[in-house]
Amino acid sequence: MHSGTVTVVNDWALFGHPLFLQRLEDLIEEVEGLAEEDPDGFHHHAHYKLLEKVEEAILVRVPTNPAAPEYFQGKTLGKENGHWRRIKNGLPNRYRLFFQFRSDAPKSIIYAWLNDEATLRKDGSKTDVYAVFLAKLKRGEIPSSFAELERDAGPIPGHAG
């Protein structure tokens, strides 16, 4: 894991794969730009709302109980990827955020990937969020094992926006 200040919530250390951390940083920068352009109305923009929901999920909801049944993704990614969890509820429609966790010490949650407008949920589509995430796993762009994911991960900022 990369060094830096680690955010800990409910005894869970929070980390992100570089793809997630970059997506989060890009989203923050975009929202900051929106705030400069329209200080009174930026909070109505879809990307502000997405950032707000992602922050709530990664800093509040998931660290409350990352093993909650609502995060199970079933067999959508295949039997061999059943260890992956996904955040669906609480995010804008058709967005998913994938993560893994380990409850043995040190307790860690690693957020791996959040889809974008080009990869929204659409069952059967080549650009469906699950199809794209599975392709990233198969190409090794995102490691499937927790140990490899942990090796690549960096700390999640304590307050993203």
Each PLM stretch: what is its role?
Residues 1-15, 29, 77-78, 82-161:
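Enriched for short, Lys/Arg-rich terminal
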Residues 1-58:
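N-terminal "first-domain core" detector
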Residues 26, 30-33, 64-68, 139, ...:
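A structural signal for alpha-helix termini and helix-coil/disorder junctions
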Residues 31, 35-38, 69, 73, ...:
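Secondary-structure transition/capping residues
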Residues 47-64, 136-144:
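A short, hydrophobic secondary-structure junction motif
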Residues 56, 60-89:
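A short, surface-exposed loop/turn module that caps and links secondary-structure elements
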